[in-house]
Regions:
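A short SAM/SAH-binding and catalytic strip from SAM-dependent methyltransferases
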Residues: 202-215
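A short, well-structured juxtamembrane/interface segment
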Residues: 113-131
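Hydrophobic anchor at the start of a short beta-strand
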Residues: 135, 154-157
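C-terminal substrate-binding/active-site "lid" region of AdoMet-derived donor-dependent transferases
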Residues: 212-280
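Conserved class I S-adenosyl-L-methionine
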Residues: 132-141
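N-terminal accessory regions of S-adenosyl-L-methionine
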Residues: 1-118
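S-adenosyl-L-methionine
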Residues: 159-203
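Conserved SAM-binding loop of SAM-dependent methyltransferases across substrates and taxa
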Residues: 142-154
Length: 281
């Protein structure tokens, strides 16, 4: 587990923050709730690993400097998964079964940042498979991935039907002490065709598009290919999982070819998402 080098002043500030429960709850309610709850939940079985993870979460979610705070929090808990998950890199805290404590942290972090984990290696992979094209992301949520990609030099435009900085978004609820959007996120035009018309020469990025037969993924992909778009970067689960809809996977099977899949993609232990690049046939 990576050690977190904190100055004496920062350690004192964090100690004072957690001791002043009323101020903690007012300034960082989501973090305060996690902090008060985590100790009562079963951990991974490694108390030092759990405490290290919690300290990283506390530090980075209460103003600790970081270019990629989501990654800097979860990187402490990345370990190889079991053989049945192909020994993939995953956030499991050193326990293939994860823990209830880690599952609660997952809820907090996904709501604050993004559902998928943007490791530095996967960000570079996305930039590589984009092959110099700018990216447009539909369903960007808080724009965390768009922010990270732009930060490493991959021009990215972000769109979401409910940008969390100005609309209620149940997946990314507002909370004090939390960044509403990390990247300028526009509301898309009324139809997918209008949106993709200006971006057909971009790579389409769908990162955890809504599942349960919500048609967003399929209608966006259909409009994109109709406009002449040819490059899709998809981060999500396979057919029947928590992301995208059946019509989306039908389109992939009928009209698209899988070019690459990031072998180093880091997932949560309890999810089956992966990062893929598809090309129109």
């Amino acid at each position: 587990m990576a050690d977190l080098a904190l100055s004496p002043q920062r350690r004192t500030a964090l100690t004072n923050l957690v001791r002043d429960e009323s101020s903690f709850a007012a300034e960082y309610p989501r973090v305060a709730d996690y902090w008060s709850t985590a100790g009562r939940l079963p951990g991974t079985g490694d108390d030092i690993a759990d405490a290290t993870f919690d300290l990283h979460l506390l530090h980075y979610m209460t103003g600790g400097a970081s270019a990629n705070p989501y990654w800097d929090i979860v990187a402490t808990a990345v370990s190889p998964g079991p053989a049945e998950r192909a020994n993939r890199a995953e956030v499991n805290g050193g326990n293939p079964k994860g823990s209830a404590r880690l599952a609660y942290a997952q809820i907090v972090l996904q709501a604050a940042y993004a559902y998928a984990i943007p490791s530095p290696a996967t960000l570079r992979w996305v930039g590589d498979v984009a092959q110099g094209r700018p990216i447009f992301e539909v369903g960007a949520g808080r724009g965390y991935w768009a922010h990270q990609l732009t930060r490493i030099g991959v021009p990215t435009s972000a769109f979401d039907s409910h940008p969390p900085d100005r609309a209620t978004n149940s997946a990314f609820p507002a909370a004090a002490g939390q960044t509403a959007t990390w990247h300028p996120t526009a509301t898309p035009p009324s139809t997918p065709a209008d949106l993709v018309a200006a971006h057909a020469d971009h790579a389409l990025f769908l990162c955890w598009p809504p599942g349960w037969e919500n048609p967003m993924a399929s209608t966006t992909l259909a409009a994109y290919q109709e406009a002449g778009g040819s490059s899709l970067i998809y981060i999500g689960e396979a057919r029947g999982g928590r992301t995208a809809d059946s019509a989306f996977f039908d389109l992939l099977e009928q009209e698209w070819t899988l070019l690459d899949q990031d072998p180093g993609y880091v997932s949560w232990w309890n999810l089956g998402d992966r990062a893929q690049c598809w090309q129109r046939r």
